[in-house]
Curated annotation (Swiss-Prot):
<keyword id="KW-0963">Cytoplasm</keyword>
<keyword id="KW-0028">Amino-acid biosynthesis</keyword>
<dbReference type="InterPro" id="IPR020557">
    <property type="entry name" value="Fumarate_lyase_CS"/>
</dbReference>
<dbReference type="InterPro" id="IPR000362">
    <property type="entry name" value="Fumarate_lyase_fam"/>
</dbReference>
<dbReference type="InterPro" id="IPR009049">
    <property type="entry name" value="Argininosuccinate_lyase"/>
</dbReference>
<comment type="similarity">
    <text>Belongs to the lyase 1 family. Argininosuccinate lyase subfamily.</text>
</comment>
<comment type="pathway">
    <text>Amino-acid biosynthesis; L-arginine biosynthesis; L-arginine from L-ornithine and carbamoyl phosphate: step 3/3.</text>
</comment>
<dbReference type="InterPro" id="IPR029419">
    <property type="entry name" value="Arg_succ_lyase_C"/>
</dbReference>
<protein>
    <recommendedName>
        <fullName>Argininosuccinate lyase</fullName>
        <ecNumber>4.3.2.1</ecNumber>
    </recommendedName>
</protein>
<dbReference type="Pfam" id="PF14698">
    <property type="entry name" value="ASL_C2"/>
</dbReference>
<dbReference type="InterPro" id="IPR008948">
    <property type="entry name" value="L-Aspartase-like"/>
</dbReference>
<dbReference type="GO" id="GO:0006526">
    <property type="term" value="P:L-arginine biosynthetic process"/>
</dbReference>
<dbReference type="InterPro" id="IPR022761">
    <property type="entry name" value="Fumarate_lyase_N"/>
</dbReference>
<dbReference type="InterPro" id="IPR024083">
    <property type="entry name" value="Fumarase/histidase_N"/>
</dbReference>
<dbReference type="GO" id="GO:0042450">
    <property type="term" value="P:arginine biosynthetic process via ornithine"/>
</dbReference>
<dbReference type="GO" id="GO:0004056">
    <property type="term" value="F:argininosuccinate lyase activity"/>
</dbReference>
<dbReference type="Pfam" id="PF00206">
    <property type="entry name" value="Lyase_1"/>
</dbReference>
Amino acid sequence: MSKKIASARISEKSSKLLQDLNNSLPFDKVLYREDIEGSRAHAFMLSEQGIISREDQEKIDAGLQDILADIESGLFKLEGDDEDIHMAIEGELTRRIGDAGKRLHTARSRNDQVALDFRLYVQRNTKTIAELLLKNIETFVKVAEENAETMLPGMTHLQHAQPINFGYHMMAYASMFKRDYERFMSSYERNNYSPIGCAALAGTPHPINRQTTSDKLGFNAPTLNCLDTVSDRDFALEILFNISTVMMHMSRLSEELILWSAAEFKWVTLSDRHATGSSIMPQKKNPDIPELLRGKTGRVNGNLVALLTVMKSLPLAYNKDMQEDKEGVFDSVRTAILSLQVLEEMIADMTVNKEAMERACMVGHLSATDLADYLVKEQGLPFRDAYHITGNVVNLAEEKGLDISELSLEDLQSIDERIAEDVVALLDNRASMNARQSEGGTATVRTLEQIEDLKKWLEKQDEK
């Protein structure tokens, strides 16, 4: 391990407790790739501007590439008493190449260096999560297409409401994930600006060219204001919020999968490789994956609130409080990536029990609204009158132990003689489902349109 780089101002050795509190290497070593990438770009710019020699730049570049290779092979371990990943790599570089390594930090502060490394990490993982969202959407669309005619009770208040198809239900989650994808990509563009060159807070007197490093690192342009840049963690808050929203959507789907796989429903069966057993009850098959996804949502929400709380009262510019920005982001990113991977695999492998879903449609009088709509459209009744008549019909069905769709015409007319024979066919659950032909509705033909629209959208994303 390289010799620790000391502060020029502090004359006494740091307290061991201060070191334990202050040192971030145990967690920010995750940023080694970004730190090396940023340093190579910075050294290139310094050379282009004549601030350091080409010879020194080439030594720095080769040394950094060697360090990267040694980290990834395990030859160079990021451990020891270095304060952070930045000091660890700079110190090791200087040990390897001598004085040229000491020139690397010219016209740079750890403030803009940290901002750069962290932003590069967030940008890279924003793209990774966005790609996983697309993969999940593709799987949702596949399941939806296979089940555009599979009826199940649509619910409000977790009570049977109206008949829908399972494809339509899965398209609701595909729509959520589409918004999530667009949110991540919007954040990527908004945050794709280079912090390097801002130095501590006010820029630098060296004749640097921030556009050079920006271009080298793939950013759109340098950031506008250095004071803002070194203290900005909006990009970290955005990825935390975006992940929290994705996890919330996953948690809602997970809750439904947990319910649907229970004996009281049996609407879906999770594959054995995506379920666990019990240590004492041999008959059990537990939905641990959706339960864990639901539980992990609380953790990522906590990471968002934690960083919001850290940032809420900080004066400009950088403050050491901001070292608390990274662990929550690293944790949320890891959690989101693993969660999206396992969710997609689980959904692709689950079995949809179509008969159980359709049997459930005979409970709860799902076509009651169709009777009220019939009385309004065909008999000209005010909706509130039709609503009360339909309520009386439902009460009659309850008394007879039948679903409203099973009542005879005679039963219906005993409540109101204006109910004619043509209503009987409308009360069939499948007819009720397919009657909802408005744009975005649950009719099979509309569901298939939504599927085709989303397929076209997916193709456009693949072309980008």
